[in-house]
A protein has these predicted regions:
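Conserved small/polar residues in nucleotide/adenosyl-binding loops
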Residues: 267-274
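Short, ordered, surface-exposed loop/turn motifs in non-cytosolic proteins
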Residues: 276-278
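Hydrophobic/aromatic-rich core segments of domains that either
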Residues: 112-120, 125-131, 140-150, 155-247
Length: 278
């Protein structure tokens, strides 16, 4: 799963530092179970970078089952072998998308979607998953905490952040790299929005979550996105993709993806502080 030795060593170092810090409660007991090298690498990555609450809230077996289903999708879906390990590691393997409660959606969605998409191209599979998402969830505004993917299916509605969380979970369940993209403020109105990007054959495409269109890179927000000042997403781990890195923390990398929506150029500014003699 991590063929680069330096990257593998960095993940292992981050994992060990965290394990050495969190010594109470047998939080890492799952690593005492027999695992394949692939399983152990995936679990090490998840535990190195997932939020602390996720480690404490769910047993290790929950994450191990999700890891197994991620590998199952990679093995059984026709595009599994063409997804690079970097995109698989950062955009398929993680369970969390936003601040939703975690659930068993990966397994449930995979079993429901696999026969629907297995004979499609990767491009068409993304479109078909979004059609399926539209069948399950419609847009309704709300202010509550982001619902989990299965909760959104149960209620059959969600705001844009919930629809995009749900759609990312559905795409990842069948081994398609996906991420939630967020703009905190449009240029034309004092409002925000969240949607989805999916990786197809070396390129990231955008789509309106639960808003199916005949092609990718088409949505009601094409025009406002082309004038937006910030489109960003958070990626678990030390992500070293081609996108502009805005911020790094020990747990995630925040990237700016605005160049997927409009031509961009860079201006370098230097601030000088002038001290007054007053």
């Amino acid at each position: 799963m991590i063929s680069d030795e330096a990257e593998r060593a960095a993940v292992q170092q981050d994992f060990e530092a965290r394990r050495d810090t969190l010594t109470q409660g047998n939080l890492f007991q799952v690593f005492e179970q027999p695992m394949s090298d692939e399983q152990k690498e995936a679990m090490t990555f998840l535990y190195a970078y997932m939020p602390l609450a996720d480690i404490a809230d769910h047993p290790g077996e929950f994450y191990l089952e999700n890891v197994d289903y991620a590998f199952k999708a990679r093995e059984e879906m026709p595009w599994g072998k063409v997804v690079p390990e970097r995109e698989f590691r950062h955009f398929v393997l993680p369970i969390r998308v936003n601040n939703e409660n975690l659930d068993d959606s990966r397994k449930v969605f995979y079993e429901e979607l696999k026969d629907r998409v297995k004979n499609l191209s990767l491009y068409d599979a993304v479109l078909e998953v979004n059609h399926w998402c539209h069948e399950k969830v419609i847009y309704t505004p709300s202010d509550a905490r982001t619902s989990s993917p299965l909760a959104s299916v149960k209620t059959a509605y969600g705001r844009c952040g919930e629809e995009s969380t749900f759609t990312v979970a559905a795409l990842r369940s069948v081994g398609i790299p996906a991420r939630q993209v967020y703009t905190p403020r449009w240029a034309h109105t004092d409002d925000n929005h969240a949607w989805v990007e999916a990786w197809v054959d070396g390129k990231w495409y955008f789509l309106g979550a639960c808003e199916p269109e005949p092609v990718l890179n088409l949505g009601w927000f094409n025009a406002p996105a082309s004038r937006g000042m910030l489109m960003h997403t958070k990626v678990f781990g030390r992500y070293n993709g081609p996108e502009e890195v805005m911020y790094r923390t020990p747990r995630y990398t925040e990237i700016n993806v605005i160049d997927n929506y409009a031509p961009v150029s860079y201006t370098h500014l230097r601030a000088h502080e002038t001290r007054s003699n007053l």
